[in-house]
């Protein structure tokens, strides 16, 4: 008899927040979603939840990976005074001691100067690299300010490719 193999269904209201359903999804791998008229309107599985988490988390993780790559490029190449020169004007109370104290825009300000770029010893086009960094900065601002539209495919793809590019530079010993 099929009834003997059944287990109780795990049901949540369609109005319940996804966050509150996480525990049930985690424990049982799914929840059934119940409409106000008590009909079952759908199912949310652990796989659905994992994919949604990946979509939301991936941009943050990629931006972090890219920032770490840029910091690695800049590490030990500049004095604290030179790093402070990249600071946004009027931000005098902030002290910059290492590349990790710079904002993303300040990375761009620092390396767009030819004299600073030369110190990095990267055999790639400065304007192209700075342009890509600037695009990362723009995407980063959308990501960090929780753009309700999320990240479009082109921006996600760009972040993945740029993170991979920095990884290749590291793998070949360029940084």
What residue spans do the PLM features occupy?
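Bateman (tandem CBS) regulatory domains
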Residues: 1-10, 45-48
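Amphipathic alpha-helical interface elements
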Residues: 15-35, 39-138, 142-175
